[in-house]
């Protein structure tokens, strides 16, 4: 590792001025850190994906209808459920990493609680769609037998959706604690784990690396547990008890519960939550507006791209079985290769967010540039490898020579597409770390749905380029998106991003409250401070009214660490607003249930 850093130092010595301007100082150390952080995250993503693959493999041996049903069910669950939860929970990438990088680490626990409540509410509209799976599929002219079995699978999967949401949220809770723990005395910001952020701290202690592994590897272990349970359950329910598609759905549910319970117990038993958890707090009901201002763009940023792939598969189904099969093969290749930039994207998001939370804009820029340069090299290698193996990859998935020939024609285009898509993915991590998801959502929406897909449809159906036309349109899309992300981040105001990170972590409001509370005189008529006699360490701060809250289950230090919400709502306001949110979500579910009943009768 020292040699890597020495190499970078030589580059900055003047032998290659152009390279020294491109490569940030400390690039070797930062690249190693990103790889160490994203490596387990890559394995975690692969293991999550494997649960659905195993279900498909078991049902594939039952027949074509069963295989089509499970494939369609997994796609429906992902598009109408999982993608929404993953997108909304991506707000935690910004909020948790920035809060953990700040001195106000207990705020991470509040964000976890807030995210759990929001995602549970979002389950209700998703369930409304799940209830009407068969009717939706028939509306799109899918096979009746396939639609019926797909409905069975999705109905069984309904209780598994909140479990998947919770599992994803717990994973983000760990991911965004970064290079963790135990080095308070080394950090210039009094922030555990941030000493590595500075070039002067060129090597990691074994203790810090061991503690870092405690944060990242539990996710991988939970994925291993989930896959083992899934394999055994599928064998028992599908192959032994002959429950068919229903058995596969039950196996999926069981595995989701198993890995979620394992991860939760691991966090509690290993006490990984102590630094960031101050107990249940009513503050999780506050500040939903800022949360949604990040969550909705995050969801759109992810779902826009995710849904574009599904639309592409649907369009290929309108052509022929050969085109659809070739698209399915390329989709599987794309999914596997995407896991690498996705893991690195999460690592970059964590590093950038923690650095901004610690007000270290130099390190934030270093992490962003290092991540982008790393993925450029990796994606070029992968793209070249895919092009070289274009005639062999198709044989892994099928024996049909027509499909294999078509796949080999399209893979060179996909290999170029992968390079730009991977760069976009890592830039997405930079945008999440800086809290700029809205720009990413706008770029993805424009490039995919105004440029990429329309161009792909034109080339596919009008120019008659078939599947090649679709991927050429997608290539134009990611090329333009990459150009937009490069231009935007080059002009990004990192100091302003650090100030916004201070707001996200709750430090700004806390500092204002503390500074104002110490002023004498008439200021107290606006903001009053009351210190309890029994616990002088607890300060109860109120804005323009004398409402206060004491949690006797917290220590004085923990209560002091929790920040005041940006705009505190009264109990009455909370009941009205959160009750309205619950009512709206419940009404959506009731509408879905009503539609199902009426459609079934007719």
Curated annotation (Swiss-Prot):
A GO MF term: transmembrane transporter activity
Main localization, broad class: membrane
UniProt organism field: Homo sapiens
GO cellular component terms listed in the entry, alphabetical order: apical plasma membrane; membrane; plasma membrane
Transmembrane segments: 34-54, 67-87, 120-140, 154-174, 220-240, 249-269, 290-309, 328-348, 369-389, 403-423, 443-463, 467-487, 579-599
Compartment annotation: Cell membrane; Apical cell membrane
InterPro entries: MATE_euk, MATE_fam
Keyword Membrane: yes
Superkingdom field: Eukaryota
One Pfam family from the record: MatE
Role: Multidrug efflux pump that functions as a H(+)/organic cation antiporter. Mediates the efflux of cationic compounds, such as the model cations, tetraethylammonium (TEA) and 1-methyl-4-phenylpyridinium (MPP+), the platinum-based drug oxaliplatin or weak bases that are positively charged at physiological pH, cimetidine, the platinum-based drugs cisplatin and oxaliplatin or the antidiabetic drug metformin. Mediates the efflux of endogenous compounds such as, creatinine, thiamine and estrone-3-sulfate.
Coiled-coil ranges (or none): none
The keyword Cell membrane belongs to this UniProt entry's keyword annotation: yes
Membrane topology reported for the UniProt record: Multi-pass membrane protein
Family listed: Belongs to the multi antimicrobial extrusion (MATE) (TC 2.A.66.1) family.
Extracellular side: 55-66, 141-153, 241-248, 310-327, 390-402, 464-466, 600-602
Catalytic activity: thiamine(out) + H(+)(in) = thiamine(in) + H(+)(out); estrone 3-sulfate(in) + H(+)(out) = estrone 3-sulfate(out) + H(+)(in); creatinine(in) + H(+)(out) = creatinine(out) + H(+)(in)
PANTHER family named in the record: MULTIDRUG RESISTANCE PROTEIN
Region (Disordered): 503-529
Activity across pH: Optimum pH is 9.0. Active from pH 6 to 9.
Protein name: Multidrug and toxin extrusion protein 2
UniProt biased composition (Polar residues): 507-518
Extent of the signal sequence: none
GO biological process: one example: xenobiotic detoxification by transmembrane export across the plasma membrane
Cytoplasmic side: 1-33, 88-119, 175-219, 270-289, 349-368, 424-442, 488-578
Keywords assigned: Antiport, Cell membrane, Membrane, Transmembrane, Transmembrane helix, Transport
């Amino acid at each position: 590792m020292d040699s890597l850093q020495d190499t970078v130092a030589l580059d900055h010595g003047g032998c290659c001025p152009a390279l020294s301007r491109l490569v940030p100082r400390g690039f070797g150390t930062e690249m190693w850190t990103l790889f160490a952080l994203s490596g387990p995250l890559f394995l975690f993503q692969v293991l999550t994906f494997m649960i659905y693959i195993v279900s498909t493999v078991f049902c594939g041996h039952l027949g074509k209808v069963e295989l089509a049903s499970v494939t369609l069910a997994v796609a429906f669950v992902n598009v109408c459920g999982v993608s929404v939860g993953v997108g909304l929970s991506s707000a935690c990438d910004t909020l948790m990493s920035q809060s953990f990088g700040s001195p106000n680490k207990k705020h991470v626990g509040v964000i976890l609680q807030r995210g759990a409540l929001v995602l549970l509410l979002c389950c209700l509209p998703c369930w409304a769609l799940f209830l009407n799976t068969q009717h939706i599929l028939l509306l799109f002219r899918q096979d009746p037998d396939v639609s019926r079995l797909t409905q069975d699978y999705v109905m069984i999967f309904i209780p598994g959706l909140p479990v998947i949401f919770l599992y994803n949220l717990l994973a983000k809770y760990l991911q965004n604690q970064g290079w963790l723990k135990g080095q308070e005395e080394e950090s210039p910001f009094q922030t555990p784990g941030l000493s590595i952020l500075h070039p002067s701290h060129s090597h990691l202690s074994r203790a810090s690396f061991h503690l870092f592994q405690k944060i990242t590897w539990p996710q991988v272990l939970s994925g291993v547990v989930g896959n083992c349970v899934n394999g055994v359950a599928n064998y028992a329910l599908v192959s032994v008890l002959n429950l068919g598609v229903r058995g596969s759905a039950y196996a999926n549910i069981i595995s989701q519960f198993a890995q979620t319970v394992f991860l939760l117990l691991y966090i509690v038993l290993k006490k990984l939550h102590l630094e960031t958890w101050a107990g249940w707090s009513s503050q999780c009901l506050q500040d939903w507006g800022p949360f949604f201002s990040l969550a909705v763009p995050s969801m759109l940023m992810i779902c826009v791209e995710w849904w574009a792939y599904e639309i592409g598969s649907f369009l290929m189904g309108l052509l022929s079985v050969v085109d659809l099969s070739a698209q399915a093969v390329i989709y599987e290749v794309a999914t596997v290769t995407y896991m690498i930039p996705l893991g690195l994207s999460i690592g970059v998001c964590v590093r950038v967010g923690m650095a901004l939370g610690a007000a270290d804009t130099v390190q934030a820029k270093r992490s962003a540039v290092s991540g982008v340069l790393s993925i450029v090299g990796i994606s070029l290698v992968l793209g070249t490898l895919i092009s070289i193996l274009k005639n062999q990859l198709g044989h892994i998935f099928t024996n049909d020579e027509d499909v294999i020939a078509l796949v080999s024609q399209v893979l060179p285009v996909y290999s170029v597409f992968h390079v730009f898509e991977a760069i976009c993915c890592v830039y997405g991590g930079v945008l999440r770390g800086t809290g700029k998801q809205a720009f990413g959502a706008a770029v993805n929406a424009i490039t995919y749905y105004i440029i990429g897909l329309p161009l792909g449809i034109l080339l596919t159906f009008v120019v008659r380029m078939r599947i090649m036309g679709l991927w050429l349109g997608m290539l134009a899309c990611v090329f333009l998106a990459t150009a937009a992300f490069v231009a935007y981040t080059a002009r990004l105001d990192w100091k302003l991003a650090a100030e916004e990170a201070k707001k996200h972590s709750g430090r700004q409001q806390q500092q204002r409250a503390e500074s104002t509370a110490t002023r004498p005189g008439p200021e107290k008529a606006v903001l009053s401070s009351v210190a309890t006699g029994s616990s002088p360490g607890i300060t109860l701060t109120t804005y323009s009214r004398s409402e206060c809250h004491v949690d006797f289950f917290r220590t004085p230090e923990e209560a002091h660490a929790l920040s005041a919400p940006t705009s505190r709502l009264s109990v009455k306001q909370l009941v009205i607003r959160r009750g309205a949110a619950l009512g709206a979500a419940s009404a959506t579910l009731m509408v879905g249930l009503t539609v199902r009943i009426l459609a079934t009768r007719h």
